[in-house]
């Protein structure tokens, strides 16, 4: 009953107005007031500041500067694996893409085409492939890193809703991740042997009070919030990334969805839905057929 009421409130709430206001507060530089807000947040959510590159709260000029804080260089060593976890969070779902359909929660799925902004050609690459969805909670580190080496080929900003993203909305809002505002980043995988070229996608999904999403090569992608899909291509000047290198961040956080083509990734046996995960842990290895 409580969960149904929460979902109803999600539909009724002025989500964009709340998000704009939250972004204003998060970017405000109010000295002692800002530091008090940060201290409250640390206590409320149990944030481990011992892992932060800058543990002194008074050194953060704004809440967003704290929220997107860097970690100590030794805080997240990379496992020896072809694919490592790109974020701190919890696995929402993972597994095989059934044709175009990605499992969201019991009774709900959404299509790769919808997730990727309606691009049928791009979605076709991931038909019968694999996916993993990771939810970032408020206490988590909110920078996003590369699960493997890759060469950036395109970025797509898809306008959409701003529902909260959590287990309750995953169960109660059909097509949640393909309805919310999102930024799609597509990379080439390094070729190995005679294997044909493959790509993978990292999708940054927005939510209520997620003020914006940013990438390291573009900066803040939203705002501005366009009414239509915007797309950038990098074939002329491709950007190469190493495994574990930072590629983006949430200014207030949400969810990452990863997509791979068929016969590309074999997930670690330890990767299970609802399990907490950390940046750099082994996610899986390449499949060669």
Regions from the language model: what does each represent?
Residues 1-289:
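Contiguous, well-folded functional domains in the mature portion of proteins
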């Amino acid at each position: 009953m409580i969960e149904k009421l929460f979902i109803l409130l999600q539909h009724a709430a002025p989500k964009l107005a709340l998000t704009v206001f939250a972004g204003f507060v998060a970017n405000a530089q109010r000295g002692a007031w800002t530091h008090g807000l940060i201290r409250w947040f640390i206590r409320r959510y149990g944030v481990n500041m011992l892992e932060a590159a800058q543990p002194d709260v008074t050194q953060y000029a704004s809440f967003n500067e704290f929220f997107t804080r860097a970690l100590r260089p030794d805080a997240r060593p990379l496992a020896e694996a072809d694919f490592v976890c790109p974020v701190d969070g919890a696995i929402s779902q993972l597994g095989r893409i059934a044709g175009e359909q990605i499992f969201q929660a019991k009774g709900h799925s959404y299509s790769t085409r919808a997730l990727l902004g309606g691009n049928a050609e791009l979605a076709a690459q991931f038909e019968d492939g694999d996916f993993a969805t990771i939810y970032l909670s408020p206490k988590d580190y909110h920078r996003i890193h590369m699960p493997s080496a890759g060469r950036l080929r395109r970025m797509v900003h898809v306008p959409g809703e701003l529902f909260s993203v959590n287990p309750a909305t995953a169960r109660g809002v059909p097509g949640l991740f393909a309805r919310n505002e999102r930024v799609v980043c597509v990379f080439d995988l390094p070729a190995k042997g005679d294997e044909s070229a493959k790509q993978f996608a990292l999708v940054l999904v927005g939510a209520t009070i997620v003020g914006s999403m940013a990438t390291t090569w573009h900066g803040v992608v939203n705002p501005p919030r366009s009414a239509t899909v915007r797309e950038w291509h990098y074939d002329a000047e491709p950007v190469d990334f190493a495994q574990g290198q930072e590629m983006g961040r949430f200014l207030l956080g949400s969810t990452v969805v990863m997509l791979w083509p068929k016969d590309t990734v074999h997930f670690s046996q330890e990767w299970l839905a609802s399990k907490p995960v950390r940046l750099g842990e082994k996610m899986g290895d390449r499949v060669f057929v």
